[in-house]
A protein has these predicted regions:
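An N-terminal amphipathic alpha-helical segment
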Residues: 1-44
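Acidic, low-complexity, intrinsically disordered interaction modules
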Residues: 31-89
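Feature targets compositionally biased, intrinsically disordered low-complexity regions
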Residues: 18, 23, 63, 79-83, ...
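Short intrinsically disordered terminal tails
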Residues: 1-3, 93-96
Length: 96
């Protein structure tokens, strides 16, 4: 039976695999459909994002977890000189 990974373990796994490809902090958001679950988000470098997502999702699958890993980006705002970031998101983590 597959299970969901907890937030502390997902941070350790991602930091061990990604190493220097992550910059900044990780963030935890409440899941929109289930308030008991969290989505963990990391800032990542764009050129490594897809490769990291595939590697992390494969690692979680092998370990028996069913969490989905996504890569998302924010739109760049030229006027405000902000945005344009790339994020690695691990959805549906158990708080822990």
């Amino acid at each position: 039976m597959q299970k969901l990974i907890n937030t502390k373990l997902v941070r350790k796994i991602v930091r061990a695999i990604a190493g220097d490809n992550i910059y900044g902090q990780s963030y935890t958001d409440i899941n929109v459909t289930n308030n008991d679950l969290r989505n963990v988000t990391f800032f990542v470098y764009e050129h490594k994002a897809q490769e990291l997502a595939k590697e992390i999702e494969a690692m979680l699958f092998i370990a028996g977890y069913k969490n989905k890993v996504k890569v998302t980006t924010s739109k760049y705002n030229e006027m405000g000189r902000c945005g344009g970031n790339t994020y690695l998101r691990i959805n549906n983590c158990v708080l822990g």
